[in-house]
Amino acid sequence: MNWRRISSHRLVSQWTGKSWRSMHSPTLFRMARALQENPKHWPDGATLLDDKVALQSIRALRSKWRASSATLEHHDHGAGSRVKHGSGQTNRAVSHLARHVLTQESDAEAMARWLRSLDTHGKVLELGTSLGLTAMHFVRSGWDVETWEGCPNTMAWARSGWQSLGVEGCVRSRVGTFQSMLEDLDENACWDVVFLDGHHEGQATRHLVDALAPRVRQALVVDDIAWSEGMHEAWMAVQDSEDWRVSVVWRGRGILLKAPHMAKQRVCLA
């Protein structure tokens, strides 16, 4: 495993990355402040909306699922989960997914704050719904949330969670392969920010990033860029595209910014 891949890992980048205090660009300065965890330094306007869905409600649901004895018949169209269960038809314990696969609360809240700091309203697309908790955090940003999932059973579980918290009307959801849903899009469909957290395979990731680029107004986030050699190679490759001016590594994720006003650059945030 090479150093660049190691330094992109969530547990490493938070120690080797730069603080928000060292960001000279106003765009990166505001972004880095929103992503860090000390409320004292959050940018103005980044506070999330408890009236949409309370953090305590999401936290309680996460805890409930961690203790659940339920299983899901799960079909993975990609390369398996970030803990490397194989692809294909498998029975997956909900407790396992809740403990090891879901985005951590601190990261999901930070990304929702970042959305809120970009604008009070926008459109965000998530590819890889899983149990639906990240989408709930995104609802707290006040943005329109759309999420895609390959497994019907997983999506059904996510929808039941949204319904239990009364946010089912705040999330638009679709089921199918990412490729088929991309092909079905209206030619004018676009989002301000896209989060790609599914199909953890290098070539597929490169294809999805390239296909989504014309439909992204501001930023595209690639999760698990250090998950495998192929994923890291894909991340290194997509940064060179002229579609993106700035690439940011943050907690095991790669963030691509259109930012036409900025010089081409690569940054690692703590």
Describe the function of each predicted region:
Residues M1-V193, H200-A219, I225-A270:
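A short alpha-helical cap/connector motif
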